[in-house]
């Protein structure tokens, strides 16, 4: 499998630590553990006492049952914890979804510009990727008629991320 270099990460690795003003960051400023505990109104000594007694195991493959139960509660429908898999962030979730759905010879349509993984991973998996270009004049909103021309009978996936990275455009309903 030939996975292309992740260009934005390579650029950030090269320049972000020495930049006086980092205008390339894609994340919010990180919280310190103490700040997170304060926001959640959790007493630090109690938390760290429990943490010190926590046995370090490999853990449940789909994520801890307690966490999956809490995630399930967020969505008031008939889904169960069996429908929830906890991943190591969006990159891990994207990888699992694309690796599961896409293979050699498949066709994928992906909006562009977008997060590089969303088109380069299907290409690395052997799929032909058709790009639905998001245009500034359209507010970076997808053109449904253009999408219709790109989707073929053998299209395996349509990859859209919202809010779009890097444009920030939020695709609504209708």
Language model segments and positions:
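Active-site phosphate-binding strand-loop segment of PLP-dependent enzymes
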Residues: 136-174
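Generic structural signal for small/hydrophobic residues in well-ordered secondary structure
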Residues: 23-26, 71, 84, 108, ...
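Glycine-rich helix-loop-beta junction characteristic of Rossmann-like nucleotide cofactor-binding loops
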Residues: 75-78, 98-102
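A short helix-loop-beta submotif of the ANL/AMP-binding
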Residues: 124-130
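Conserved PLP-anchoring active-site segment centered on the Schiff-base-forming lysine
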Residues: 100-122
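Hydrophobic residues at beta-strand termini and immediately following loops
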Residues: 87, 130-132
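Short acidic capping loops at alpha-helix termini that bridge into adjacent secondary structure
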Residues: 80-84, 104-107, 154
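N-terminal small-domain helix-loop-helix segment of the aminotransferase-like
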Residues: 2-89
């Amino acid at each position: 499998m030939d996975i292309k270099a992740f260009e934005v990460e390579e650029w950030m690795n090269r320049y972000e630590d020495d930049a006086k003003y980092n205008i390339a960051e894609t994340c919010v400023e990180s919280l310190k553990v103490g700040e997170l505990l304060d926001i959640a109104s959790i007493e630090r000594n109690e938390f760290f006492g429990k943490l010190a007694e926590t046995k370090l195991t490999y853990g449940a493959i789909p994520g801890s049952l307690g966490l999956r139960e809490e995630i399930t509660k967020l969505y008031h429908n008939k889904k169960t914890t069996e429908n929830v898999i906890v991943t190591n962030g969006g990159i891990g979730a994207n990888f699992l979804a694309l690796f599961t759905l896409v293979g050699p010879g498949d066709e994928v349509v992906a909006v562009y510009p977008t997060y590089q993984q969303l088109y380069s991973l299907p290409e690395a998996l052997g799929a032909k990727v058709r790009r639905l270009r998001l245009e500034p004049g359209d507010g970076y909103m997808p053109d449904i008629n253009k999408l219709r021309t790109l989707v073929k009978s053998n299209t395996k996936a349509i990859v859209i991320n919202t809010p779009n990275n890097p444009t920030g455009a939020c695709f609504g309903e209708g």
